[in-house]
Regions:
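HAD-like aspartate-dependent phosphatase fold
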Residues: 1-215
Length: 215
């Protein structure tokens, strides 16, 4: 079996290139060296470069995020599809296999996935017909409830400017009680991205860390 030195060796063999994001051109904090150049060259040669990302963000949000980092549609890729897009299509088509229309979002809010649809995001888990499992993160107050785990939290890069800080965790302990309570309800759980871990670069600097995710 031949092991290729890099993507550039085989890119010219194909008309359409399907490219994952995390671990392919993005390491959680920066672009892998040479990755953007290879993608740009493929686009220049007329290849269709489609990014397939399992982020729960909608593609429009991901496009804007990568623009801020230096990657641009039409220059480095031609198409961008996310797990959030696919989930959103199922929502709009009312194809979720759940007993009602009330959704409780556990974790970081992702209300945009359900906006302008037949489904309603409810603030209380007791009102829910199903749970949507979003990104497990903690507010500062929630984080401080676990003083013995203080060295296991990192300021999330997903904290939007002007919003209260959100913290990623290296351990699952802070989330177990609330998940157990949901499990006891016996309701369906929905998840657009069941990754167990993701290497994320802390917002306040440092190397990417293997933080807990939805899986």
């Amino acid at each position: 079996m031949k092991i290729h030195e890099g993507f550039a060796e085989i890119a010219d063999r194909f008309d359409v290139l399907l490219v994952d994001a995390y671990g392919v051109f993005w390491d959680g904090g920066r672009f892998f060296p040479g990755s953007l150049e290879v993608m740009e060259e493929a686009v220049k040669k007329g290849r269709q470069v489609c990014i397939l990302s399992n982020t729960t963000s909608l593609s429009a949000d991901s496009v804007r995020s990568y623009e801020k980092k230096g990657m641009f549609a039409g220059r480095h890729y031609t198409d961008f599809v996310t797990s959030g897009d696919v989930f959103r299509e199922a929502v709009l088509a009312e194809k979720l296999d759940i007993p009602g229309k009330n959704i409780y979002i556990w974790g970081t809010p992702r209300a945009a996935l359900f906006a302008d649809s037949a489904y309603r995001v409810v603030p209380d888990a007791d009102e829910a017909d199903a749970f949507y499992i979003s990104i497990p993160q903690l507010t500062t107050e929630e984080k401080e409830a676990f003083p013995s785990l203080s060295g296991h939290f990192y300021l999330s890069r997903l904290t939007a400017e002007g919003e209260a800080p959100l913290w990623d965790s290296l351990v699952t302990e802070p989330f177990k009680d609330s998940l157990l309570q949901m499990r006891q309800r016996g309701l369906p759980a929905l998840c657009a991205n069941p990754d167990y871990r993701a290497f994320e670069k802390p917002k306040d600097g440092g190397e990417p860390q293997p933080v807990v995710r939805q899986g």
